[in-house]
Amino acid sequence: MARYLGPKLKLSRREGTDLFLKSGVRAIDSKCKIDTAPGQHGARKPRLSDYGSQLREKQKVRRIYGILERQFRNYYKEANRLKGNTGENLLVLLEGRLDNVVYRMGFATTRAEARQLVSHKAIVVNGRVVNIPSFQVSVNDVVAIREKSKKQARIKASLELAEQREKPTWLEVDSAKMEGVFKRVPERSDLSADINEHLIVELYSK
């Protein structure tokens, strides 16, 4: 399955909420009709069944993090193997992806842009270049912009925009040095309350 490259706002309208696939700073313009699904009959919102609600929640989270279906299912299997709450484990695994950490640290305006930085070898972890977006960052890992990439205008612009976003408490970022530390694993209370991971667990538990 190919990665979605179409209009980002269409995905947000499909899920009925801002997925922050654009800049991650400003809310989507009211003219974009976020509460109306795309298409000719978007205004008609059929009542979802339990399965429909579970599926929509899974699609929403998958799109937020930019994960393909097969990869998302593998994350769920891994979360289920770990001790503790499966749903929370799933979110922690997704938050620990290198592309997500790069985005959270403010080096990119979107996760898609962060994924591109990683793939183009602009990111180092503990001094070594890592070009795998799904690389799992561990506690105390130092994530930084590669020296030769620090002059990129888009990275500097992203750091400026990041000042307008709420800074994650589980990360420590030095914007001047363009590096950050993954201080701790995020707790559920640190993450979006707009995600209902229990619905995803119910979906995959069937």
Curated annotation (Swiss-Prot):
GO MF terms, alphabetically ordered: rRNA binding; structural constituent of ribosome
Top-rank lineage group of the source organism: Bacteria
Keyword Endoplasmic reticulum attached: no
Residue ranges of domain S4 RNA-binding in the record: 96-156
Short name of one Pfam family: Ribosomal_S4
A single GO BP: ribosomal small subunit biogenesis
UniProt entry keywords in alphabetical sequence: Ribonucleoprotein, Ribosomal protein, RNA-binding, rRNA-binding
GO cellular component, one term: small ribosomal subunit
Assembly mode: Part of the 30S ribosomal subunit. Contacts protein S5. The interaction surface between S4 and S5 is involved in control of translational fidelity.
Protein function: One of the primary rRNA binding proteins, it binds directly to 16S rRNA where it nucleates assembly of the body of the 30S subunit.
Protein family according to the UniProt entry: Belongs to the universal ribosomal protein uS4 family.
Name under which the protein is recorded: Small ribosomal subunit protein uS4
Annotated organism of origin: Haemophilus influenzae (strain ATCC 51907 / DSM 11121 / KW20 / Rd)
Taxonomic placement: Bacteria, Pseudomonadati, Pseudomonadota, Gammaproteobacteria, Pasteurellales
Gene designation: rpsD
